[in-house]
């Protein structure tokens, strides 16, 4: 075949395994672009065939003229391949390179929408092309590779059937109608939350899955009923606000922070921001702060897991009076801004100088561990005992945890500010965390030196998924979390924690001068002690209160077994329903089973709904961009290794990919991993803290980039320059 001089060709893969109705390998094989000669074409055909591996007679290649003058290119799927729901999912790139999307390159954007709803202007010409392709091939579920030229001409490169693992019942129209009914119920729920917040005087309607208490990280985006109920009762109903009110922030104890919408836990951003404003700030100024902070998040939704660091100040930091923060709150007059910062300064001094907090933390840990030690799990106990354990965890643990966590946030924020202003060396925060002798490092040390029985006596209550009853604890043989024969912890754990980093006299002098100019009533020695105490107390209180929660779930499992209910069924109960069962005192088994079935049906109807991580308006649920997150890079180290997941047989020397991880996933640090990447999480989330403790390179909160990185075989994390590179 002779190639004309006028236009280059492209050879695309068309292997038999790519286009079957039972599986799809789209994007797996090679495509070769820019072919101008017969020799190039011949070599490209051979190379593409070679990329298939073992050949079959049905394998082909596809030769096309290359599209010219491309403005936008990408892939559109006309349904969600995981659920079969009729979402249109468009992944596209505006660089003009037609291979970026299929090769998993950077810069790709994704827009998800329901048929019949509007799309961004650059994509509107794609809609009639989708309809035309579907009519031609006679299949609704298709994957279309396309380009749009600068003249708005849509070019279709390839069409494949989509392999769906979801439900295909009913006609296509029935499925669209069903999705719209579900989304209209979600829209009504959002409007209910908005009306409630309006009634509480909270301006703005932004919701998110990761601000503040990080529900997506701790219970996931589609939690079961019991996990969601426990999390809200223990943390997000009142504990969060009670702790902040004690420090001098605004009192929001009558306002829940987290709302279940479409089966997803969403944080009310207006409530969160309001709770970080000092109580002495006048109402008109507070309203401006809330509005400005939400405007910032709406403009940069990728900051949803960093709101305390980037969206609203929760303490006074050095050099805040001018620059970025002042510009961000432009609706405040200079006098209002000054008085707002003065109020933050008074509150910051109170938090840092409040040494009694750590005495109370030590007493609280002792009470929690004593209560846990008195628990004897046996079937003779009843549901009332379960509720009592949970209440002890709330009364003695979660409010205290919220207090020490807030103190640790303040410590971290000030330390990060000192690093940013080069008043302390880069990596100083990581060194402080390493020296705090917190729970993660202690667990790794204990695993290295203790016999299994002794280790499990200390840590056996920990559960990956603190609130999820279906997940085995460390001391449950079903879990098989630890390799006791081949122990491979990172480094050489010792009983003595790392020494605290030491500043030179000149550095201390500069920091103290900065503290004086900021208006702090404390010096460097007092702040350093506060920071180490806060970081250590946060982890120890978390460890202690989770013990009672874990024991309560095990007690519930024993009672459930006696009633003929398994853990799967129990996971669909809620605390109010368990309390109602206690009052009934008869026919518990039938009542609880009926409740579990009803809640499971509700969960099944919402668990495949695609909802945005940040909701600015109810209409967003019908069409939204999946924004590219700004991950937090922990430590300044570089590491490369095989991509691994928690279900892999061996994690040793791998870089672990995990969507979300609470304290129960600390077992992974006993498996000799070299690094970690999470989909959800922020600068101060659990895995960030653990990575700092252990000096482990980590990328926390990868968001939309998580999947493309996870699909690699070998990857490099360059944390100092905040870069992830796919090696192969």
What are these regions (language model features)?
Residues 10, 62, 655-659, 676-677:
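Structural motif
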Residues 2-26, 30-31, 55-69, 144-145, ...:
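ATP-grasp fold ATP-binding core
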Residues 11-14, 48, 390-394, 531:
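Short alpha-helical scaffolding segments that buttress acidic/His motifs in well-ordered protein cores
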